[in-house]
């Protein structure tokens, strides 16, 4: 065993780290099981706690909490027809139909077991792909990074909404926020309006806490729908028949896991898009498509495999290039910067033990998901009875304290509250917030690499296409923008 792997094992299996993982797992299971509290919110609420942790326990808390929250979102979807997380929404109707047929334990068991399988598959791809990509990325110059960031932002626009114009507006808003302050190549204050607090820019963490947590609190406050009732039927053995399902649907498991990992690696996509795509593909290629929507477990098997594999997939661009694959890894990148672990290829060469520790954390999180998920299913009815009108004030308190604790200033609390209101208004009007988040995270990197490239090339735009990898990334970026327009135009000319 190499010294780096030995250090990674020592870091991960430290007793303190094990306790952190268990506590974060229980927290993630609880948050995911409560309708409306998403895995992203679980991550955002953990950020203030990670201030007081070493890097590996901080990452351990986030990895385990998000993995558990993605799974436990299946529970209210199955028992109440109200998904706990967006990733569970794809197959909520299927799971609820199975519950009404007395097969709730099969639906929940499939979600649990195959989420863990998908998570392990995604982790294997992360372990195999990330070092190779990192070695390749060491050869990148500012030209390649500029196009790579632009490609990531482009994917975020087109993957998170069926209306790209709204995604583009959201992205522009995020890029505008990223421009605030002195942190730019010119060192000139931008959009500060004479406010000293804004010279350092808008804090990423208060902004994300506001956009993900405060927006949900506002949504709950204005929600007038009556609470849904739980299907009160006893749950049997959730593991019964799982081996039979694995033997019956091996292609679906592999396809869902592979698709989830691939979609997760696309910036801005995430587990929810992976689950929806996987469910649609499962129905399209099923031998029994007419059974979908009536309580057919096949779609749950494939989508469940996809949603957790997407989590590991999202870490590939985050660790290798510093480009978040989803909203969760956008928050993670902020945490890594706080811990002086700048994501990118240099992290693989300078601190390989930390990278290996991340691999181990993903493996452990998906393994302990089985027993902890089983326990969560058993106590799920008690969790779902927790009154949300008591829970939301507690969450609000955590948000305020966490935002204030970053710099001990009320300005960050104001940023959090304003961001929450803006995110709520955006989502209520059909604007996705993921492009805005990626704009905030990647705006500085985009500008820095653009300015650096312009200086290198003495102002020549042709240099952006001169290197083979840069030209390839440029072609991909332009194709994502213009191919849909070209296809639409050709269809119009053909009269289709």
Regions found by a protein language model. Give the residues of each.
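Helix-loop-helix hairpins and the membrane-proximal interhelical loops
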Residues: 1-56, 131, 138, 191-296, ...
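Transmembrane alpha-helix interface/packing and boundary motifs in multi-pass membrane proteins
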Residues: 25-39, 68-81, 156-161, 258-267, ...
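Short helix-coil transition sites and intra-membrane helix breaks within transmembrane domains
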Residues: 30-41, 78-89, 121-125, 263-273, ...
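Re-entrant/interfacial helical elements at transmembrane boundaries that shape
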Residues: 39-49, 77-97, 128, 171-172, ...
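Membrane-interface alpha-helices at helix entry/exit sites of multi-pass transporters
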Residues: 56-60, 97-114, 287-299, 328-330, ...
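A structural-propensity feature for long, helix-poor, extended segments
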Residues: 66-77, 84-85, 296-321, 325, ...
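Membrane-embedded alpha-helical segments of transport systems
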Residues: 67-72, 113-125, 133, 177, ...
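Membrane-embedded alpha-helical modules
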Residues: 109-224, 338-491
